[in-house]
C-alpha cells in the first residue's frame, strides 16, 4: 500500500532503525533521513555508520548527518546548511526517534504537522536519554512507548498515544529494547495512517505529577556496591545488559557480571564476600540478602555461564569483591 504523507525521519540507533523500516515498508515516502555523524567503534575504532544510516543507504534514501541543528551552537555553518536542507525538502511531518541531537524551535516549526517523537517510556515517567535502563533499574512493573508532539522541552510534549508492556523479572535492557522498538514501530505507523486520513492527531498535555528523568548511563555506574540489597543489584545487572554491564573487582581484576538473581539468605559474611561457589552459581553476600551470579566475563574474555567460567578461572568461598566507591 502506498501513502502520500511525506515523512522526514531523524534517528540514530537500532531502536530508531526499526521505526524507519516500518514507515518505509508501510509505503510512506521518506525524502530525507537525519542521523548522527559516523562514529569510531569496535576494536579497530573505525568509523561506523549508524543503523539508521545503513538502512537509508540500503534503500536509496537521502541521508544528512549534521553534527548540530543549533545555529548558535558549536557548528553554526553545518546547522544552517541542515536547516536549509530541511526547508528545501518537501515533507508533511517529521518523525524523531532516539536521534541524539537537540531540535530547536526553528526546526520543530518546519514541517506542517510538526515533529512526532517515539519515546521508550510511559511519559512523564523517565523523560531523557536512558528510559529503558532506568525503568528496569528502578524495579518498575511496566513501561511502554509514548508518541508525543515535540516541543522545545526535554520530552515534555503533548502525548498522542501510548502502548504498555510488562517488565518481566528476566528482562534485560536488550530484551526490553527489542520489544519496545517493535511496539514503537507499529505505533508510529498507525499514527501516520491516522494523520494522513484525518489531517490531525489528537493529543493531551503531559501531567505535571509523576515526571522523572532518566539520566544517561555513565560507565562508573557499572560497579556493584555490595552494601546495597541483593534485589537492587540484580536489577542493576539486568538494566546494564548490554551496556555497560555489571562490574565487580576481585584481586585487581574487573569481572563483568551479565546474569544474576537475588536469593533469600541470611548472610553473616561481609558484603562482597563469596559465600558459595558451584556450577549453578557464585553466591555473594550483599547488604541485604545475597546475589547468585550465573554468567560472568573475565577481562579480555567472553560471556560465559558460571559452569564454563569456573573451568578456566578459580573462585572460592571466602574471597571478597572490592566495595565500589561512591561517585
Curated annotation (Swiss-Prot):
GO terms for cellular component: cytosol. It catalyses: L-methionyl-tRNA(fMet) + (6R)-10-formyltetrahydrofolate = N-formyl-L-methionyl-tRNA(fMet) + (6S)-5,6,7,8-tetrahydrofolate + H(+). Its EC number is 2.1.2.9. Gene3D superfamilies: Formyl transferase, C-terminal domain, Formyl transferase, N-terminal domain. (6S)-5,6,7,8-tetrahydrofolate binds at residues 121-124. The keyword Transferase applies. The keyword GTP-binding does not apply. Keywords: Protein biosynthesis, Transferase. One of its GO terms (molecular function) is methionyl-tRNA formyltransferase activity. Belongs to the Fmt family. Attaches a formyl group to the free amino group of methionyl-tRNA(fMet). The formyl group appears to play a dual role in the initiator identity of N-formylmethionyl-tRNA by promoting its recognition by IF2 and preventing the misappropriation of this tRNA by the elongation apparatus. This is Methionyl-tRNA formyltransferase. It comes from Paraburkholderia phymatum (strain DSM 17167 / CIP 108236 / LMG 21445 / STM815).
Amino acid at each position: 500500500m502506498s501513502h502520500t504523507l511525506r515523512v522526514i525521519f531523524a534517528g540514530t540507533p537500532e531502536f530508531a532503525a526499526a521505526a524507519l523500516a516500518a514507515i518505509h515498508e508501510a509505503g510512506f515516502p521518506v525524502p530525507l533521513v537525519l542521523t548522527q555523524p559516523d562514529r569510531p567503534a569496535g576494536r579497530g575504532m573505525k568509523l561506523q555508520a549508524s543503523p539508521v544510516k545503513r538502512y537509508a543507504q540500503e534503500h536509496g534514501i537521502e541521508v544528512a548527518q549534521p553534527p548540530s541543528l543549533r545555529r548558535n551552537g558549536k557548528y553554526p555553518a553545518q546547522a544552517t546548511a541542515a536547516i536549509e536542507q530541511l526547508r528545501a525538502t518537501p515533507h508533511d511531518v517529521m518523525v524523531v526517534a532516539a536521534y541524539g541531537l537537540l531540535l530547536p524551535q526553528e526546526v520543530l516549526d518546519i514541517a506542517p504537522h510538526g515533529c512526532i517523537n517515539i519515546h521508550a517510556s510511559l511519559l512523564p515517567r523517565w523523560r531523557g536519554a536512558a528510559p529503558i535502563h532506568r525503568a528496569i533499574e528502578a524495579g518498575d512493573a511496566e513501561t511502554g512507548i509514548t508518541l508525543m508532539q515535540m516541543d522545545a522541552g526535554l520530552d515534555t510534549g503533548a502525548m498522542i498515544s501510548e502502548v504498555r508492556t510488562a517488565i518481566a523479572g528476566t528482562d534485560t535492557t536488550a530484551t526490553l529494547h527489542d520489544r519496545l522498538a517493535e511496539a514503537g514501530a507499529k505505533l508510529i505507523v498507525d499514527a501516520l495512517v491516522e494523520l494522513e486520513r484525518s489531517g490531525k492527531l489528537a493529543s493531551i498535555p503531559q501531567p505535571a505529577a509523576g515526571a522523572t528523568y532518566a539520566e544517561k548511563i555513565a560507565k562508573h555506574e557499572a560497579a556493584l556496591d555490595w552494601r546495597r540489597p541483593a534485589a537492587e543489584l540484580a536489577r542493576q545487572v539486568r538494566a546494564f545488559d548490554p551496556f555497560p554491564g555489571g562490574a565487580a573487582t576481585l584481586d585487581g581484576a574487573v569481572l563483568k557480571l551479565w546474569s544474576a538473581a537475588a536469593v533469600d539468605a541470611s548472610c553473616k559474611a561481609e558484603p562482597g564476600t563469596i559465600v558459595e561457589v558451584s556450577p549453578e552459581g557464585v553466591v555473594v553476600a550483599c547488604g541485604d540478602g545475597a546475589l547468585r551470579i550465573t554468567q560472568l566475563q573475565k577481562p579480555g574474555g567472553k560471556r560465559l555461564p558460571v559452569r564454563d567460567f569456573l573451568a578456566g578461572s578459580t573462585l572460592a568461598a571466602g574471597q571478597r569483591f572490592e566495595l565500589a566507591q561512591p561517585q
